[in-house]
Structure formats: structure tokens, C-alpha cells
Curated annotation (Swiss-Prot):
Keywords: Metal-binding, Repeat, Transcription, Transcription regulation, Zinc, Zinc-finger. It comes from Caenorhabditis elegans. GO terms for molecular function: DNA-binding transcription factor activity; RNA polymerase II cis-regulatory region sequence-specific DNA binding; zinc ion binding. InterPro entries: Znf_C2H2_sf (IPR036236), Znf_C2H2_type (IPR013087). Residues 19-41, 248-272 are annotated as: Disordered. The keyword Transcription regulation applies. This is Zinc finger protein ztf-2. GO terms for biological process: negative regulation of transcription by RNA polymerase II; nematode pharynx morphogenesis. The keyword Transcription applies.
């Protein structure tokens, strides 16, 4: 009995160790940094802290969230500090590969804290520490110029091309014509997989949501659902592509719903329509009132205001103007200031008799 119980205990311990080995392996990889903790990322910290803030306030640039050192001061340090120029620390013997690495390392031996938070009194020696502090404490995601994420309304035109005046080589970054944008905030990326993960983890929803409550992770499932019990009008797409104006794929001048994410400029549309239509000249058409003709007080006020409101409008229909003039001709109160409408020739009795003889 003792041997059997011992074997049973060994089997149970072996089984437990076998079952717990994947979890131990996962913990080991997380400690070594091989596996990222999704609840400890910057996006997760922002989503956990900034529940009451609007989404457009969560993504800011480095200059808007962090106050950094002056660039001229940093350049003087690189020129005057021998440790930076030789890439070797004279205090501890640390050797670095880059100038920026040596500048960051020199702050370890000094009390310099050049980075300051713009929302509190927190200071730090390194920028990465302040970026994490702003995300964890204030719920703001700092988007740097080297990060993969991009703010939709941020204009970083200076980072589009890097041209050197001393050399003939000019490296121009080619922009992709299609990006993907989150409709719930201002996050944008060129990969749809990043946007799908962003919507799922940050906003706790799916890329495609139906008004009936159904959620879909891809467009194919949403289209199949819209062809069945629900219509395509009921679908809300939280991830939509955005196009540049020069792109042939850009659906410019196309009408879309508020959930599509593709917006057009109404002023540009109106200018295109008005430029394509002929503009009528005042006084050139007999259906329009000439501005030089006097208007007598016997003219009806409501008709007068209607004509004055229609006259300078370039999009007025001539058919409406003809109907309005015909109503004036049939009206008993006709002004005497329109010679083209009221005949001014008065026939004598003899002429009237001649006309009667001709008609007879």
C-alpha cells in the first residue's frame, strides 16, 4: 500500500508539473521580455485611466505633453563633452555606440532632469519615463515621430522627406495612398491588423458592428450578415480606409453616410456645381427684372420681395421666373412702369372703327 500511494503521489506531482509547465514558460518569457504583457502597454494604460476624457484628447505629440531640453544646449554638450565625442564614460568606463546613448548615460551620474511633465510637477532624466508617466497618470498617449501610430489630424510635413543640402542625395519617404483610420478616435495606421487590434483592446468593440448587436472581426462576415436578416445600412464600420486626394482610389465627390468615415467638402462641391452652370446676366433675359427699371409703390410688397430675392441668385430656375411673370400679367394691380408689358398707344375712334371693319 505504501508503494502504491507513493507511485500515485509521484504520478500526481508529475501531472501537475506537466500541466503547469506552459504557464511557467509563459511567465519566464514575460520576465525576460520575450512576451509582452497586453495590460501593461501604453494603449492599455491610456484606456484604463482616460475613461472620462474624449478620444481626441488622448493622443498628443511630444511637444504638447512633455517639455524637453533645448536643442542648442544639447548640441553644445555634444561639442564640448569629451565623453560624448569619444563614446566612453570617464566616470564608470561605459562605452556607447551613439552620441544620443552617451548623452542619456551621462545623466546617470548627474542630477540633471531635463524632461518635465506639462500636467504636473513630475520630472525625469529620460523621455521614455515621462511618456509612460503621462500614459499611466494622465491617460494621454504620447505619439512620437518614431512611433508606428499616427494622429489623423497631426501635420508632420517636415518628416515626410529628409533632404541634405551638402550632398546631392535626397531621400524622400514615399507615402502610401491608403491608410486605415479608427472611427472612434484619431488613431491611424497603414496596417489593418493594427487597427483591428486597436479597436478590440482600446475601445472594447469589433471593427464591424451591426445595429442589431452583432459584431464581426472582418468585412466578409459583415457583408454576409448584411445580405441576410439586416441591411447594409445597419452596419457600422469602426475601421475605414482613408485616401489621399491624388489617389485614383479616392472616392471624391461621392455621397456617403456618417458612419463611412469618407467625408467630402460641401463648399468645394458647391463651387464645382456653380462653376459648371451658366450664370445669367442681369437684364439680358426678358424674364428677369432689369435693375434700372423703377418700381412703383403700387407693386405688391410680397411679389416685389420675391423677385428681388430671386434676381441675384445664379441658380434660379427660369421656369419659376416665367410662372412668376405670368402671375403678374394676370394680376389686376399691374405697375405702369413696365413699357414692355403695358401698351402705350391709344387708338382714336376712327382707328377703332377701321379695326372693327377689318374684323367683320
Amino acid at each position: 500500500m505504501n508503494c502504491e500511494s507513493l507511485l500515485t503521489a509521484l504520478d500526481v506531482s508529475t501531472l501537475l508539473s506537466t500541466l503547469s509547465s506552459p504557464e511557467k514558460e509563459h511567465r519566464r518569457k514575460r520576465r525576460r521580455g520575450e512576451v509582452a504583457n497586453p495590460s501593461n502597454t501604453l494603449d492599455a494604460l491610456v484606456a484604463r485611466k482616460a475613461d472620462d476624457q474624449p478620444f481626441e484628447k488622448r493622443y498628443l505629440s511630444e511637444q504638447e505633453a512633455i517639455e524637453g531640453p533645448d536643442d542648442e544646449i544639447e548640441m553644445k554638450k555634444m561639442e564640448l563633452d569629451p565623453d560624448v565625442s569619444t563614446r566612453t564614460c570617464s566616470t564608470c568606463g561605459y562605452q556607447g555606440k551613439w552620441v544620443s546613448e552617451m548623452i542619456r548615460h551621462k545623466r546617470v551620474h548627474t542630477s540633471e532632469r531635463p524632461f518635465k511633465c506639462r500636467y504636473c510637477s513630475r520630472t525625469s532624466k529620460w523621455k521614455a519615463d515621462l511618456i509612460r508617466h503621462v500614459a499611466k497618470t494622465h491617460g494621454i498617449r504620447v505619439v512620437s515621430k518614431y512611433s508606428r501610430s499616427k494622429v489623423f489630424d497631426a501635420t508632420n510635413s517636415s518628416m515626410d522627406s529628409s533632404c541634405s543640402s551638402d550632398s546631392d542625395r535626397c531621400i524622400i519617404s514615399e507615402k502610401r495612398t491608403v491608410f486605415y483610420r479608427c472611427q472612434l478616435c484619431s488613431f491611424e495606421d497603414e496596417r489593418v491588423s493594427v487597427l483591428n487590434s486597436h479597436v478590440s483592446h482600446l475601445h472594447n468593440t469589433s471593427p464591424c458592428v451591426c445595429r442589431c448587436g452583432a459584431k464581426f472581426e472582418d468585412v466578409q462576415g459583415a457583408l454576409a450578415h448584411s445580405n441576410g436578416p439586416c441591411s447594409h445600412v445597419d452596419m457600422i464600420y469602426n475601421v475605414m480606409p482613408t485616401y489621399e486626394k491624388a489617389s485614383p482610389l479616392s472616392p471624391c465627390r461621392s455621397e456617403s453616410s456618417s458612419d463611412s468615415g469618407i467625408q467630402t467638402d460641401p463648399e468645394e462641391e458647391a463651387s464645382i456645381i456653380t462653376s459648371s452652370l451658366p450664370t445669367p446676366q442681369l437684364g439680358s433675359s426678358p424674364l428677369l427684372l432689369s435693375p434700372t427699371l423703377p418700381v412703383t409703390p403700387s407693386f405688391l410688397p410680397d411679389i416685389q420681395s420675391a423677385l428681388l430675392s430671386l434676381q441675384p441668385n445664379p441658380l434660379m430656375s427660369l421656369y419659376l421666373a416665367s410662372l412668376l411673370q405670368s402671375s403678374l400679367l394676370n394680376s389686376p394691380t399691374i405697375p405702369t412702369s413696365f413699357p414692355q408689358i403695358i401698351p402705350t398707344t391709344i387708338l382714336t375712334p376712327s382707328q377703332q372703327d377701321e379695326m372693327v371693319d377689318v374684323e367683320m
